[in-house]
Amino acid sequence: MRKLLPVLMAATVASAAAAQTIPNRESARIQNRLAWEHMKVEAWEKAAGMFRQAISLDPTYEYAYYGLGRANMAMKKYVEAIAALEKCGSLYRAEAGRRFANAQEAQRYRRDRIMEIDDQIRQVQSMPQSAKSADQLRQLQNLRRLEQDRIQRGNNMDIDATVPAYVSLSLGSAYFRAGKLGDAEREYKAAIAADAKAGEAHSNLAVVYLETGRLSEAEKAVRAAERAGYKIHPQLKQDIKERAKGGA
């Protein structure tokens, strides 16, 4: 028995350590909700700390990385924002094409996904309303409808995952503010590919085109944003017009 005791103790310690490494999504979601409460009152550093706690509980929690990216953006920590948002996107891409063992596992994943989207919808609704938040809310509601449709069909055991447009949009903005216009352009285009009605992505792409001297593309991007119902800042239109006159 004495010989067995160290073995049993070692096994217990190993089991406890293993348990600590298993992603804990429910606890991470609680930390994430608390982080967004700090975001509402612009307590960016506290929010970032809460997002990091959520990530430590579940390193696969995409939305916590998105929140951390947004918090770092607000603090003008663009390198850190890019890292968090890139990780968020890579987690979404890693899910694409994954196949479930059975239909029950697929349905459980989709129900959990809807629950997380509902969390995100509530968080966006609680933030100050703007064109940006309205567009993100529309995207989230569309994602929810897609997941609900998949649950009702019930026979698809593959994950149809793409990076949400609002993630690519935020990453593009982080790149833009870091002076990386080529990377910003790529991410704005990715946002538009994911959601053609992402008006802010069209508008931001127009700014990139303006900054890089592609005025006809800038005008097209402005028109695309307006078709999507996005209100373009008058100064952007004026800047494009004046630059076009100067080059005539």
Language model: regions and residue ranges:
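Canonical tetratricopeptide repeat
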Residues: 33, 67, 101-102, 170, ...
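Terminal, low-structured helical/coil segments at or just beyond the last alpha-helical repeat
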Residues: 117-165, 217-248
